[in-house]
C-alpha cells in the first residue's frame, strides 16, 4: 500500500469511528497527476446522493503535460463501494454531527483507493485534550529513550 495523499486535518477535526476502503472514478490525467503527487484532500468530504457516494473538494491539480482535454481540479468524483456499505453510510450520514471524510488516497494493485472514514466533529476542548495527550506521549517516549 503506497500512500499518495493524506488528510492530516481529519484526525484533528474528527473522532474517527469507522473506516471504509473505496474505489474512485478518475480520468487518465487525474491518475497521472496523482502519480506525480499533485493534489490535496484537506478540505474534502463525501456525501450520499441517489444511492451513490460522491467526493467533493478533493483538489487534484491539472496534469502539467495535459492538453485542452485536461480535468477540472475540484470536480466531484464518484466513490465505488458495495451496496450494503452505501446503505450503511447513508444511515450514518443522516445523523447530525457526523461526516464522511477521506483519510488518504493510496495505490492498491495499480488502482487508486480512498480510505473513507465516518467521523464525529470535535469541539475546541476535545482538540486541546488531543494535543495535550500527544505531547505527554511524546515526552514519555523521549524519557524512555534517554534511559536506554
Report residues per predicted region:
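A positional/architectural concept
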Residues: 2-48, 52
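C-terminal end-helix/capping segment
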Residues: 74, 81-87, 120-148
Amino acid at each position: 500500500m503506497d500512500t499518495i495523499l493524506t488528510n492530516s486535518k481529519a484526525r484533528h477535526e474528527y473522532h474517527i469511528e469507522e473506516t471504509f476502503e473505496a474505489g474512485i472514478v478518475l480520468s487518465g490525467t487525474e491518475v497521472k497527476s496523482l502519480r506525480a503527487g499533485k493534489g490535496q484532500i484537506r478540505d474534502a468530504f463525501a456525501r450520499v446522493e441517489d444511492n451513490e457516494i460522491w467526493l467533493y473538494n478533493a483538489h487534484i491539480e491539472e496534469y502539467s503535460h495535459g492538453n485542452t482535454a485536461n480535468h477540472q481540479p475540484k470536480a466531484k468524483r464518484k466513490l465505488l463501494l458495495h451496496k450494503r456499505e452505501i446503505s450503511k453510510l447513508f444511515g450514518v450520514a443522516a445523523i447530525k454531527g457526523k461526516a464522511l471524510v477521506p483519510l488518504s488516497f493510496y495505490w492498491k494493485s495499480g488502482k487508486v483507493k480512498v480510505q473513507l472514514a465516518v467521523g464525529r466533529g470535535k469541539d475546541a476542548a476535545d482538540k486541546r485534550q488531543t494535543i495535550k495527550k500527544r505531547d505527554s506521549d511524546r515526552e514519555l517516549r523521549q524519557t524512555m529513550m534517554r534511559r536506554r
